[in-house]
Amino acid sequence: MKSNTFDTIVVGAGMSGGWAAKEFSEQGFKTLLLERGPNVEHIKDYPTTNMQPWEFKNRGRLTAQDVKENPIASRCYAFKEDAKHFFVKDQEHPYVQKKPFDWIRGYQVGGKSIMWARQVQRWSKYDFEGPARDGFAVDWPIRYDDLAPWYTYVEKFVGVSGNKD
């Protein structure tokens, strides 16, 4: 049997894992990206994208059965009739918790980013200064200016555009 050797192995093809694999590959590392879920093809795998609210059986709302079967996932704002197929089913993959902690999961290429409208806004200088300004929690070890060039790098790659307003 042929042995496969990799310089880097990335587990999870969510937003961070996918980006890490891209960066390693572009630097010439032989990279293996492992994902437990399916690939999500644009348009084809978004069966509800072009549906209007009145076209859903429950007008986009959850049923009592949905909530009963998914007590954790159903607490997420995005777990609705139009997107619940991207969430891991709580009964099939139960949570083990010592203390309450709502952690949603999505097993597919893109991970949870597919479940929260694929939107991420830049934090501002104000956001990074919160702990120091408000006098609680642990201060950030970096500031906005440290991340700004990386924000620009990623935004250029993914095609972010628009006004600064």
Stretch-by-stretch model annotation:
Residues 2-131, 136, 141, 145, ...:
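N-terminal glycine-rich phosphate/pyrophosphate-binding loop and immediately adjacent elements
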Residues 42-45, 161-165:
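Short, glycine/acidic-rich hinge or "gate" loops at secondary-structure transitions
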Residues 150-158:
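A structural-propensity feature for long, helix-poor, extended segments
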